[in-house]
Amino acid sequence: MIDIKELSKVYLVGDERVKALDQATLHIYPHEFVSIIGPSGSGKSTLMNIIGCLDVADAGTYHLDGLPIEAYTENQLAQIRNRKIGFVFQSFNLIPKLSAEENVELPLIYQKVPRNERQVRVRAALERVGLAHRAKHLPTELSGGQQQRVAIARALVTNPSLILADEPTGNLDSKTSKEIMDIFHELHAQGNTIVLITHDNDVAKQASRAIHILDGQITEVAL
């Protein structure tokens, strides 16, 4: 599924070279639920961006479903992202003027899926997160937890190989956070591969496996 070997990434900040990743190596198997945990500045966001094909490493190799990611152009990476990866963000990233179902539909429009099929798949995705009854509502008419459910439905609608969630409970209260984590557990039980980025130990421990990152290095892989 995900095979990363000795990844390194350096950024220039003014005149200073900052090593965001330092020969990081990890393997994530199909259908796993894995958390990547680390403090601010640990390199977890850089690792997430590379796993999500939003950035490329300076050195090392990354294979996603057997594809050598570093060999692809930016346009090809965009196609891989849209086909293989569903993203869930801390800030939901919903378009305010679009209804819940229209937000969920967007990735399918990009894929040029026929309208009738789009409608069926959008409905099914919203049902999976328990929000079909709010399909016509705008984001401003939904609670934070409901907006995150819409974001999860949007991630699911393309049937991706990988769900990549970046601090998905970061803006939510404890009760709503539990509800969102329950959805991730249900999705994992249904066979989805989930990688969850977090700084919260309590959230990280809910995954089947926790990968700890510090100063750009994988320091521990805990069951």
For each feature predicted by the language model, list its residue ranges.
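ABC family nucleotide-binding domain
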Residues: 2-214
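Conserved switch/coupling elements of ABC/ABC-like ATPase nucleotide-binding domains
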Residues: 215-221
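Generic detector of intrinsically disordered, low-complexity segments in short proteins
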Residues: 43, 222-223
